[in-house]
Structure formats: structure tokens, C-alpha cells
């Protein structure tokens, strides 16, 4: 099964719900790629010996890896951490996540400042580009096991919105402007 993504509704209900619009408005992998979001479907049961994962890591320079179990039983201050992850932010570097078990949502902003919800399930590996506004939450299952990949030592520093003057945000917006061939208002 391929990655599922859709435009979100404007509801303030529980962040762990799907938040589909009515009718549903699905988002293609091609559209995500235009935003700089990359995707691979891998075998999470064989991640330790997966040659495709090894090739991705080698090609993209991901030389650091760790595993993260997110659930109320394994994370102290779980609700507070989930709230922090759900605060809209950017990073200076790519955010690379590979879902090994469970499920959750990455939300990203498109060029028109609309939220797109990406449902991560086992086998989904995504790369969010540096400078894209995004956030993360678990879904109603309240469990996900993620592999985090980094170039070099891990740095996970969120820069909460607004960050329009941040150099990495400007670079991201410039890239969108070039890709779409039109001026894109910074969000």
C-alpha cells in the first residue's frame, strides 16, 4: 500500500483524528515531491539487512541512525512531548523518518499554506526538506516506532513559526519559486 496523504479540514478536534475534508481531497506523491517531500516504501521487518535502505542511506549521506518508540507507556511527559511535536516548526536540516511499527501523522504546509496530512504506516520512509513548515502527531493508535536518520551527529532543533527570515526558510521558498516558475508568498 502506498503512502496516504490528504488536505486537512480546519477542525480543532483531537489532533490524532484523520481530519479529512468532506469530500476527501487526496494528495499525490507527485505533489508531495513538488514540495520537496520524498518517499520510499520499504520492508520494515528487514530494516537491519535491507539493501535498499542501505543504498538510500549511502546515497544521501545518512550516517547516523536511532530508533524511537513513542507511546504513553514508554515516554515520560508523553502528552507534553506530543504537544511540542505538534507545534508548527522548521528545521535547518532534512527530517528523515522511517516507520517500523504503529502509525502517526506528519503534517506539512503546501505553497498555498494549506495543511497536508501524511499518514505514516509501517514501511513508509519520508524525507521532509529543510525549511518546510511541519508538525507531527500520533494517530488514535497512540503508538509508533520510528527510525530517525541524520547526516552526522543528530540535531533536532525546531524553529517555531514564524521563521520567514530564517535563511533555510528563505532557501526553501526560493526553491519552490523556482520549481513552480512563479513568485510564492512565504508562509
Swiss-Prot record:
Q: What residues bear N-acetylalanine in this entry? A: 2
* Residues that bind Fe(2+): 89, 91, 95, 134
Question: What sort of enzyme, by top EC class, is this?
Answer: oxidoreductase
User: Its catalytic activity?
Assistant: 1,2-dihydroxy-5-(methylsulfanyl)pent-1-en-3-one + O2 = 4-methylsulfanyl-2-oxobutanoate + formate + 2 H(+); 1,2-dihydroxy-5-(methylsulfanyl)pent-1-en-3-one + O2 = 3-(methylsulfanyl)propanoate + CO + formate + 2 H(+)
Highest taxon of the source?
Answer: Eukaryota
An example Gene Ontology molecular-function term: acireductone dioxygenase (Ni2+-requiring) activity
| Enzyme Commission identifier(s) | 1.13.11.54, 1.13.11.53
Gene3D superfamilies, per database record: Jelly Rolls
Instruction: Give a GO cellular-component term.
Output: nucleus
- The entry's keywords: Acetylation, Amino-acid biosynthesis, Cytoplasm, Dioxygenase, Iron, Metal-binding, Methionine biosynthesis, Nickel, Nucleus, Oxidoreductase
Pathway info: Amino-acid biosynthesis; L-methionine biosynthesis via salvage pathway; L-methionine from S-methyl-5-thio-alpha-D-ribose 1-phosphate: step 5/6
Q: Name one GO biological process term.
A: L-methionine salvage from methylthioadenosine
Q: What does the record give as cofactor?
A: Fe(2+); Ni(2+)
Binding-site residues, Ni(2+): 89, 91, 95, 134
Sorted alphabetically, which InterPro entries does this protein's record hold?
A: ARD (IPR004313), ARD_euk (IPR027496), RmlC-like_jellyroll (IPR014710), RmlC_Cupin_sf (IPR011051)
The signal sequence is none
Q: How is the cofactor bound?
A: Binds either 1 Fe or Ni cation per monomer. Iron-binding promotes an acireductone dioxygenase reaction producing 2-keto-4-methylthiobutyrate, while nickel-binding promotes an acireductone dioxygenase reaction producing 3-(methylsulfanyl)propanoate.
Compartments where located: Cytoplasm; Nucleus
Q: Which Pfam families match?
A: ARD
Record family assignment: Belongs to the acireductone dioxygenase (ARD) family.
Q: What does this protein do?
A: Catalyzes 2 different reactions between oxygen and the acireductone 1,2-dihydroxy-3-keto-5-methylthiopentene (DHK-MTPene) depending upon the metal bound in the active site. Fe-containing acireductone dioxygenase (Fe-ARD) produces formate and 2-keto-4-methylthiobutyrate (KMTB), the alpha-ketoacid precursor of methionine in the methionine recycle pathway. Ni-containing acireductone dioxygenase (Ni-ARD) produces methylthiopropionate, carbon monoxide and formate, and does not lie on the methionine recycle pathway.
The name this protein carries in UniProt is: Acireductone dioxygenase 4
This chain's source organism reads Arabidopsis thaliana (Mouse-ear cress)
The encoding gene is ARD4
